[in-house]
């Protein structure tokens, strides 16, 4: 190129930005054709106005609307000419654009809004004066790699596909070290087409240019667009570097692309457009693995316990651990008396048989316990599917429920215990060993085949007992108290009967004595005695009737008269014997009377 538009080389290549997939936002159409039609597409008889694009091979210019600079504004305007590459320093090309006399460097993504002025905005803020595209194939400094170019202090982004028509710096252009801007297009100086074989991009594409968060907010950099049809990424250039780039600024008119050839769709670099991510294929929701944890396992809840991670936890050795032993624990439950009813046939078995059976059971338990590991060393692995939480284990110290006599024990974990044995620590142990006080009041616990545990009560200290576990007893003292009490009751009853009959007998004797004292003779007996005595004493005749009524009227007098004759009779023999030895006296008189 020449300075001021006098360069003999008019075949300089221009780098035109690709158009987006949607119509321009200002809704304007190009009006670069002469004739009466100021809007719309040209007709065959209309001659084009302004510069024509020429292919790189030196062919003739064409008026095809699909070929040319897209988005350029009016003819002769500095903002309507696409940026021209300038290979001044190295393969990292600087892009310059014509201005009204100033070859200022324009930064992509300038904070100046679209349509704010006719002149390009310089990117001279801070240590960086311009932006230059990074050659393809270089690693991005954002990934921890540095750019091989000189004076590059800011991170750069990857360039798009090089098939976009980026000109080769070795095309015989003038020395780009001059850093002069390209003159504006004139009717006698057409702008050549950099790549006639370049097809227009798909209108469905978009360019997103967000702010990359640099230290200086006035120099935003566009985001990488690795796909074809996108703008090349630019790298910041140091202030002392001669490689510069100029871009046309949008016009303040509502139609900045008027009188432009070809399609006028243009994407302004300063206006970032969000790109919506294509919705992916709807996937079914993932199955969330849920694992339960138990506070007794020493776990710390989800995320820190046994169920965290969804993977099976392993021991330090690396082997997966089985389920925790706490799930196999079945501590004791209260014993039910109705579960066991021994018979007297158990007494026939000797103590030796029971002791031998206990020894055999202990040996079996030791063999089973030999293959088990310590309870504290187990870590239950997390299952892939949710599992039902185990039922809360009963508290320790309570006896386990034992099966009823004659029934087989319920199998646990594909194993079962015989009658009289319970599962403890994943092994079968006898009830007599686990519960030392299974039999009360000094009873002895025995294991009977097919019947379970049996209690033999202490018959030496106690006379009677009751219950399957000797819980009810009767002592000798109790028997003695019952016997003494019964005897006392019988004696008391006999005493009461004796007293009763003795009193009755006493009353009978008293009444009988009274009857004897109050008994008198009858009047007839008294008359007969008085008559005989009176007649004998007085010498009266027994046939004396006048004296009879008088005796009946006075019954008390015969008593006195009776005593007098008795006394006379008792003294008469003595007097007769003394006075008259030969006479018989009163007895003789009685005999004579008789």
From Swiss-Prot:
Main location: membrane
Bias kind Acidic residues: ranges: 349-375
Compartment list: Cell membrane
Protein name: Chondroitin sulfate proteoglycan 5
Residues with glycosylation annotation: 26, 44, 413, 425
Disulfide-bond pairs as recorded: 432-445, 439-455, 457-470
Leader sequence residues: 1-18
Low complexity biased stretches: 140-181, 248-259
Stretches with biased composition (Polar residues): 1-12
Organism ancestry: Eukaryota, Metazoa, Chordata, Craniata, Vertebrata
Keyword Transcription regulation: no
Annotated region described as Disordered, given as residue ranges: 1-325, 343-418, 535-594
Biased composition (Pro residues): 182-195, 219-229
Source species, domain of life: Eukaryota
Renumbered residue ranges of the record's region Interaction with TNC and TNR: 338-377
Keyword Cell membrane on entry: yes
Gene designation: CSPG5
Function, in words: May function as a growth and differentiation factor involved in neuritogenesis and more particularly in neurite extension.
Species this protein is from: Gallus gallus (Chicken)
Domain EGF-like stretches: 429-471
Membrane topology label: Single-pass type I membrane protein
TM spans (from-to): 482-502
Pfam families noted in UniProt: Chon_Sulph_att, Neural_ProG_Cyt
């Amino acid at each position: 190129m020449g300075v001021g538009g006098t360069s003999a080389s008019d075949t300089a290549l221009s780098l035109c930005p690709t158009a987006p997939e949607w119509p321009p936002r200002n809704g304007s159409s190009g009006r670069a054709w002469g004739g009466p039609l100021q809007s719309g597409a040209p007709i065959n008889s209309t001659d084009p106005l302004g510069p024509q694009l020429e292919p790189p091979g030196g062919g003739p210019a064409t008026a095809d609307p699909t070929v040319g600079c897209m988005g350029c504004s009016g003819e002769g305007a500095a903002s309507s000419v696409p940026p021209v590459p300038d290979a001044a320093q190295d393969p990292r090309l600087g892009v310059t654009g014509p201005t009204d006399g100033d070859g200022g460097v324009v930064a992509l993504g300038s904070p100046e809004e679209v349509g704010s002025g006719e002149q390009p905005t310089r990117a001279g803020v801070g240590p960086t004066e311009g932006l230059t595209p990074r050659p393809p194939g270089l690693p991005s400094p954002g990934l921890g790699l540095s750019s091989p170019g000189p004076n590059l202090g800011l991170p750069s982004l990857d360039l798009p596909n090089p098939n976009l028509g980026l000109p080769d710096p070795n095309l015989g252009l003038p020395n780009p070290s001059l850093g002069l801007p390209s003159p504006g297009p004139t009717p006698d100086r057409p702008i050549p087409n950099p790549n006639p074989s370049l097809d227009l991009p798909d209108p469905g594409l978009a360019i997103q240019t967000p702010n990359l968060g640099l230290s200086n907010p006035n120099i935003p950099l566009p985001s990488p667009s690795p796909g074809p049809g996108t703008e090349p990424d630019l790298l910041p250039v140091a202030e002392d570097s001669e490689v510069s780039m100029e871009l046309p600024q949008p016009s303040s008119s509502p139609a900045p692309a008027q009188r432009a050839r070809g399609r006028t769709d243009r994407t302004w670099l300063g206006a970032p457009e969000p790109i919506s991510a294509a919705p992916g294929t709807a996937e079914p929701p993932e199955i969330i693995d849920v694992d339960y944890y138990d506070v007794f396992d020493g776990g710390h809840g989800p995320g820190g316990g046994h169920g965290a991670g969804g993977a099976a936890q392993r021991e330090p050795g690396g082997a997966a651990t089985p389920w925790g032993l706490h799930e196999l624990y079945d501590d004791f439950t209260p014993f039910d008396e109705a579960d066991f009813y021994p018979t007297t046939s158990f007494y026939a078995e000797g103590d030796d048989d029971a002791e031998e059976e206990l020894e055999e059971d202990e040996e079996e338990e030791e063999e089973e316990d030999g293959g088990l590991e310590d309870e504290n060393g187990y870590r239950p692995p997390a299952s892939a599917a949710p599992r039902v939480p185990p039922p809360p284990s009963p508290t320790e110290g309570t006896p386990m429920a034992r099966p009823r006599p004659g029934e087989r024990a319920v199998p646990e974990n594909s194993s079962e215990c015989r009658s009289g044995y319970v599962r403890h620590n994943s092994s079968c142990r006898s009830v007599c060993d686990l519960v030392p006080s299974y039999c009360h009041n000094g009873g002895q616990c025995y294991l009977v085949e097919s019947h379970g545990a049996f209690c033999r009560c202490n018959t030496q200290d106690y006379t009677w007992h009751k219950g399957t576990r000797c819980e009810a007893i009767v002592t000798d003292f109790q028997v003695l108290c019952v016997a003494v009490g019964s005897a006392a009751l019988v004696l008391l009853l006999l005493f009461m009967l004796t007293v009763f009959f003795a009193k009755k007998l006493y009353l009978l004797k008293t009444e009988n004595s009274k009857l004897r004292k109050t008994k008198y003779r009858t009047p007839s007996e008294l008359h007969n005695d008085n008559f005989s005595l009176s007649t004998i004493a007085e010498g009266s005749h027994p046939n004396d009737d006048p004296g009879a009524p008088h005796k009946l009227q006075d019954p008390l007098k015969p008593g006195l008269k009776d005593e007098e004759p008795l006394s006379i009779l008792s003294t008469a023999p003595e007097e007769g014997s003394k006075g008259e030895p030969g006479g018989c006296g009163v007895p003789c008189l009685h005999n004579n009377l008789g």
